[in-house]
């Protein structure tokens, strides 16, 4: 049986990275901490401006050309027959990941219920609309209003001040479903492309760094995997083909990953409420200052 090879590349433009991923990560963390420690207002403003510049480049340049990159890579894989051989594996992986989401949510709500002393199902059953909205939008930011409404319907046991503080915060920094999915996918694709999974030490480093990167990832479709592309290529050493596979397979289940993120926020809000009750923190009325318009009725804070 003869093997199929792609024609030679006519033109290729290699753009090397400015610095290694680890150097960029350590520099960003130390620079941010030092700016806070020294109260360097000018540097903080510069970093904020730089963040907006980077986000503008990502949204206006990287994301628009990303579908073409994935499409051309998959054309090559289809020409070689790789897609046909691996399609059942992809579908099985997506189903396993979705089941993993439910298992993790059960664990998370179980821990929240044990810590707070409340029935976590009273919170979980209010997250049906938010879960479906997240499946449809694939965006934590777009689902925030529905998540606030569901969390407010769960008060009690949730406290409204904890809801108004915690839910918007967790929607941006708590991406448990996306992180769980990405870790599973990189191991699977590493096995498929390279013939072996990444080493344990490499995966531990990747998971630790991914947790940091996920906190700063935007709550938009594909935000987590886009923010961690440097880790995928730098730490795991994935090439163009493996990276394109990660992006594509991640997009197949991004709806359910986002839904897991949003639904898990309710468990964290329950933990936050339990912490406030255990430490005698009185309930604040400041949430009324945040939702004192007519929109309050739409998100459930007004009766």
Kindly label every feature range from the protein language model.
Residues 43-61, 87-90, 94, 120-131, ...:
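Hydrophobic alpha-helical segments of integral membrane proteins
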Residues 51-54, 90-107, 124-134, 203-217, ...:
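Small-residue-enriched core segments of transmembrane alpha-helices in multipass membrane transport
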Residues 98-103, 134-139, 172-180, 211-223, ...:
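Hydrophobic transmembrane alpha-helical segments of multi-pass transport and channel proteins
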Residues 133-214, 282-287, 291:
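Helix-loop-helix junctions within the multi-pass membrane cores of secondary transporters/permeases
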């Amino acid at each position: 049986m003869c093997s199929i090879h792609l024609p030679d590349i006519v033109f290729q433009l290699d753009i090397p990275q400015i610095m290694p991923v680890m150097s960029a990560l350590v520099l960003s963390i130390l620079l941010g901490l030092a700016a806070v420690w020294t109260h360097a207002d000018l540097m903080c403003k510069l970093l904020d401006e730089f963040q907006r510049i980077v986000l503008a480049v990502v949204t206006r340049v990287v994301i628009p050309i990303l579908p073409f990159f994935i499409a051309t890579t998959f054309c090559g894989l289809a020409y070689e027959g790789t897609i046909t051989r691996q399609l059942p594996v992809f579908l099985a992986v997506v189903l396993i990941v979705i089941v993993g989401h439910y298992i993790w949510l059960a664990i998370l709500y179980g821990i929240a219920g044990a810590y707070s002393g409340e029935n976590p199902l009273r919170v979980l059953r209010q997250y049906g609309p938010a879960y479906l909205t997240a499946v449809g939008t694939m965006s934590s930011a777009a689902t925030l209003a529905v998540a606030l409404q569901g969390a407010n319907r769960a008060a009690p046991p949730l406290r409204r001040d904890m809801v108004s503080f915690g839910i918007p915060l967790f929607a941006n920094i708590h991406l448990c479903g996306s992180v769980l999915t990405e870790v599973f996918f990189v191991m699977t694709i590493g096995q498929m492309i390279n013939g072996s999974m990444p080493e344990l030490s490499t995966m531990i480093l990747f998971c630790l760094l991914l947790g940091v990167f996920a906190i700063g990832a935007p709550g938009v479709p594909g935000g987590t995997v886009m923010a961690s592309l440097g880790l995928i290529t730098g730490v795991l050493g994935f090439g163009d083909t493996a990276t394109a596979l990660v992006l594509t397979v991640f997009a197949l289940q991004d709806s359910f990953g986002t839904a897991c993120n949003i639904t898990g926020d309710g468990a964290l809000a329950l933990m936050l409420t339990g912490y406030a009750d255990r430490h005698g923190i009185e309930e604040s009325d400041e949430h009324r200052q945040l939702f004192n318009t007519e929109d309050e009725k739409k998100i459930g804070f007004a009766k």
